């Protein structure tokens, strides 16, 4: 599992950087950290297990499948957390 998690961590990092550049058009280190931290991943599952799953999908099916897994399982949780964070930062 450790090797899969190591690969999964790298795949998640690449996905996060590409996502930030596509959505925001800027390099945003703090957002990257929020998207990839163990604290955030714990909202999805046990962080090492989540990264290992990403790594397994990548190794067995390739980058597109791993990115799709992240889009289906990680991105929605991050989106909800960001909405909540923005509500706290900019109260109505």
Question: Model-derived features: where do they sit?
Answer:
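RNase III-family endoribonuclease catalytic core
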Residues: 1-92
């Amino acid at each position: 599992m450790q090797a899969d998690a190591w690969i999964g961590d790298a795949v998640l990092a690449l996905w996060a950087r590409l996502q930030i550049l596509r959505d925001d058009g800027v390099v945003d280190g703090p957002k990257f950290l929020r998207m990839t931290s163990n604290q955030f991943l714990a909202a999805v599952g046990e962080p090492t297990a989540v990264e290992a799953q990403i790594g397994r999908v990548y190794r067995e099916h390739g980058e597109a499948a791993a990115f799709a897994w992240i889009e289906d399982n990680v991105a929605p949780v991050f989106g909800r957390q960001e909405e909540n964070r923005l509500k706290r930062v900019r109260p109505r």
